[in-house]
Regions:
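Active-site neighborhood of glycoside hydrolase catalytic domains
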Residues: 122-201
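N-terminal carbohydrate-binding accessory modules
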Residues: 1-48, 78, 82-86
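Conserved, mostly hydrophobic/aromatic
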Residues: 14, 41, 49, 80, ...
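An active-site-proximal structural segment forming one wall of the substrate-binding cleft
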Residues: 69-89, 111-149
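Aromatic- and acidic-residue-enriched carbohydrate-binding clefts of CAZyme catalytic domains
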Residues: 15, 52-64, 69, 73, ...
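Catalytic-core region of carbohydrate-active enzymes that cleave or remodel glycosidic bonds
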Residues: 75-81, 85, 177-178, 210-256
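Short, solvent-exposed turn/loop segments enriched in Gly/Ser/Thr/Pro and often Arg
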Residues: 27, 49-56, 90-100, 150-155, ...
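Aromatic-lined substrate-binding rim segments of carbohydrate-active enzymes
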Residues: 34-100, 172-177, 181-182
Length: 256
């Protein structure tokens, strides 16, 4: 059993703790390679692995859930723990992640009038029914119960999309009612409009960026209420679109 808290910094079992995490998305890698990839993550100095959870993979048809093979998230979490890594989970209904429909199931659009990522009862009903299955599986792996999970995230980059605080609060309520006890965070672009739209009272905001670190953290600091600064996604590259020119990143000095 253990504890993880957010105060002026992060505290693991009562001691200050610096999260050094890297992203490995279990659903993009065959299970036979999970251990290898996690060992490599640890070898470069990371103490934590972070992953999204794609709704459209785990519930490709309404009410039909899949958590085996590449989608065996419990096995992935356990493998990380066996290697001495902590885990950050991002079980947002929407994940972006350069993934089909941002991880939302396409069958949502079969309902007339469907409204996504807002306080709309038909949408939230589907989210809740999915969470009833998902959160029951992952709650037992929280650090408070002897597992490696130290943080979970609410939604994803919501400030780019809307600012429906009722929606965010309802997601938080559902998570806590379903047994989530580790601290929760939000994750947004480190700009005033994004942070205002995506933040939620009592939840630590974190930033996503890939350059001008000092400037980005200065903006994020305005919203953390004295809490720690965290970059949830530090982009070391960028994707190319078919038919467009390629992207070339600057040097390390420009990035940091």
């Amino acid at each position: 059993m253990g504890t993880f808290e957010i105060k002026d910094t992060f505290y693991l079992n009562g001691e200050p703790f610096q999260i050094i995490s890297g992203a490995i998305h279990y659903f993009r890698i065959v299970p036979e390679y999970w251990k290898d990839r996690l060992e490599k993550l640890k070898a470069i100095g990371c103490n934590t692995v972070e992953t999204y959870i794609p709704w459209n993979m785990h519930e490709p048809q309404k009410g039909h859930f899949h958590f085996d093979g590449m989608l065996d998230i419990e096995k992935f979490i356990q493998t990380a723990q066996d290697l001495g890594l902590y885990v950050i989970l991002r079980p947002s209904p929407y994940i972006c992640a350069e993934w089909e429909f941002g991880g939302l199931p396409a069958w949502l659009l079969a309902e007339d009038g469907m409204k996504l990522r807002v306080n709309y009862e038909p949408f939230l009903r589907h989210v809740y029914e999915y969470y009833d299955v998902l959160l029951k599986k992952i709650a037992a792996y929280q650090i408070n119960f002897g597992g490696p999970v130290i943080l979970m995230q609410i939604e994803n980059e919501y400030g780019y999309y809307a600012n429906d605080k009722d929606y965010l609060q309802l997601l938080k309520n559902k998570m806590t009612e379903s047994g989530v006890v580790v601290p929760l965070v939000t994750s947004d672009g480190p700009f005033e409009a994004n942070l205002k739209g995506g933040r939620l009272t009592g939840v630590l905001p974190t930033g996503n960026f890939g350059s001008k670190t000092e400037e980005r953290f200065d903006e994020l600091k305005k919203f953390t209420n004295g809490g720690p600064l965290m970059c949830t996604e530090f982009w070391v590259g960028w994707f190319d679109h078919w038919g467009n020119g390629g992207h070339m990143r600057g040097d390390l000095e420009q990035s940091v």
